[in-house]
Amino acid sequence: MSGITAALVKELRERTGAGMMECKKALVEANGDIELAIDNMRKSGQAKAAKKAGRVAAEGIILAEVAADGKFGALVELNCETDFVAKDAGFIAFGKDVMAAVLADKTDDIEALKAKFEDARTALVAKIGENINIRRVAILEGEELGTYLHGARIGVLVAAKGANEELIKHIAMHVAASKPEYVRPEDVPADVVEHEHQIQMDIAMQSGKPREIAEKMVTGRMNKFTGEISLTGQHFVMDPSKTVGDLLKENNAEIINFVRFEVGEGIEKVEADFAAEVAAMSK
């Protein structure tokens, strides 16, 4: 169990739905590599498709806006330490100033933005008493752009062609809810497809069926896999009887690209070992 922390076991349980002992065993066999442990658990049938990593640990806000000309849009993530500060008027105003600069300069150069706003950030940190960070910026250009904010924690920016404002808004809401990773199934990178294909072949071969039958089974599973992680292949949240691709076809529209930000995604919270803290304090 050296190097296999309780936090790692907990994360594996949350991502796979498997029991604690199965997760411990899988992590030991994978030498603490959680992604390898998930692959092995899927191959052995202990876990189905696992949830993506991305524990939300930071607080903050997402800002989303399209420029006045309608041809340029941006998302900005601004982080702080507590939910209380995320609602502070000064913090929100600082975020709006950053967004205004992004739209004015038409830039996603995060380092240049940080340098530009460092004095203002430092002053705000001194006033509020929490660290503040301009974490990331994304920009899109296109004929038709639209945004959607779910609270201030999830933001989506969509670039489309041949779509009206309402359709773009509905697509953006779908992206917020369903978290697609790519626009179309054919956009899924070859290495991602190959990785999943190998897992599915290992699972299919365990059924004892001939290889050619297993390959046919896997073809169907792979079509499902690429469809589920791509926008056009997903069932539309507002009408699951059709896919987003069907909806776009009905409206003679096309999605060029999209970006989805969620506050803190990918930032892992450093969890203190409470027992160790108490022991240290008693020395």
From Swiss-Prot:
It comes from the Bacteria. GO terms for molecular function: translation elongation factor activity. InterPro entries: EF-Ts_dimer_sf, Transl_elong_EFTs/EF1B, Transl_elong_EFTs/EF1B_dimer, Transl_elong_Ts_CS, UBA-like_sf. One of its GO terms (cellular component) is cytoplasm. PROSITE patterns: EF_TS_1 (PS01126), EF_TS_2 (PS01127). Keywords: Cytoplasm, Elongation factor, Protein biosynthesis. Pfam families: EF_TS. It is found in: Cytoplasm. SUPFAM superfamilies: Elongation factor Ts (EF-Ts), dimerisation domain, UBA-like. Residues 82-85 are annotated as: Involved in Mg(2+) ion dislocation from EF-Tu. CDD domains: UBA_EF-Ts. NCBIfam families: tsf. Associates with the EF-Tu.GDP complex and induces the exchange of GDP to GTP. It remains bound to the aminoacyl-tRNA.EF-Tu.GTP complex up to the GTP hydrolysis stage on the ribosome. Belongs to the EF-Ts family. This is Elongation factor Ts.
